[in-house]
């Protein structure tokens, strides 16, 4: 076992020594050949420094376009999507007449897609990714990448919808009823295809009732009236066979009773 380990160490050291010698003394062509080989082997960490140096060595020459193309992908290969996206976009600007411009712009949008954060975190990168993918589709409506862009945008939209839905429910569960009403209202208005739309509309009714119930007396009549307006909105949109129809009816009855009681005072 020790003998095998020793052999592996020797091979690794020899490989490192060869790479360092190439970086120090290799000709531009030798470095280019090696960079392509490392890239082909998906050894992006070794390919990247070579490609970066070659960008300067081949400045102004036709080979630089391919070098920059590989350099951009090397960052994508190491999952550094911030720099990959920057370089893909810069490639498209630098080589505006390149046959790879369309691909580079698509990959720049894909990098934004990859950077989009999980649902529980800030969704600004998610919206940025949707915008980037839509911009690509607008620019290249007949591109072979359009279908993939649409698939990715659908995934991102579902992520946004989930976040909006969870935020609205969280406000309600924490007792922030006014915030819950606003969040639910915004969700159903901004996202017509919102998942569990009927649940959010019900929560809006329930939050309106609880907000009125927990208000000071002089504010209650106005807020109970607003609750009845939310009830009407729910009934206009959803059939009586909705699983929330009965709970909404109960809220309506309790609200009307509360209004009647307040009017006696």
Residue ranges, per PLM feature:
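Bacterial Sec signal peptide processing site at the extreme N-terminus
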Residues: 16-34, 261
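TPR-repeat structural position
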Residues: 44, 81, 126, 177, ...
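Short coil/turn linking the two alpha-helices of tandem helical-hairpin repeats
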Residues: 62, 96, 113-121, 154, ...
């Amino acid at each position: 076992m020790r003998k095998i380990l020793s052999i592996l160490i020797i091979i690794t050291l020899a490989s490192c020594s060869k790479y360092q010698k190439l970086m120090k003394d290799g000709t531009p062509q030798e470095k280019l050949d090696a960079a392509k080989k490392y890239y082909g082997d998906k050894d992006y960490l070794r390919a990247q420094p070579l490609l970066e140096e070659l960008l300067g060595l081949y400045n102004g020459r036709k080979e630089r376009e391919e070098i920059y193309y590989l350099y951009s992908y090397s960052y994508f290969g190491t999952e550094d999507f911030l720099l990959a996206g920057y370089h893909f976009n810069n490639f498209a600007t630098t080589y505006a007449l390149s046959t790879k411009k369309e691909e580079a712009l698509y990959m720049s949008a894909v990098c934004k897609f990859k950077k989009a954060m999980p649902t529980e975190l800030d969704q600004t990168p998610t919206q940025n990714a949707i915008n980037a993918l839509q911009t690509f589709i607008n620019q290249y409506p007949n591109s072979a990448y359009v279908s993939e862009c649409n698939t990715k945008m659908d995934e991102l939209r579902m992520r946004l919808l989930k976040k909006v839905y969870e935020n609205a429910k969280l406000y309600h569960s924490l007792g922030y009823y006014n915030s819950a009403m606003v969040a639910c209202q915004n969700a159903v208005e901004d996202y017509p295809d919102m998942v569990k739309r009927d649940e959010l509309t019900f929560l809006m009714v329930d939050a309106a009732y609880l907000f009125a119930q927990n208000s000071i007396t002089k504010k209650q009549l106005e807020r109970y009236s607003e609750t009845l307006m939310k009830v009407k909105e729910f009934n206009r949109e959803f059939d009586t066979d909705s699983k929330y129809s009965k709970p909404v009816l109960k809220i309506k009855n309790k609200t009307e009773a509360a209004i009647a009681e307040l009017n006696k005072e």
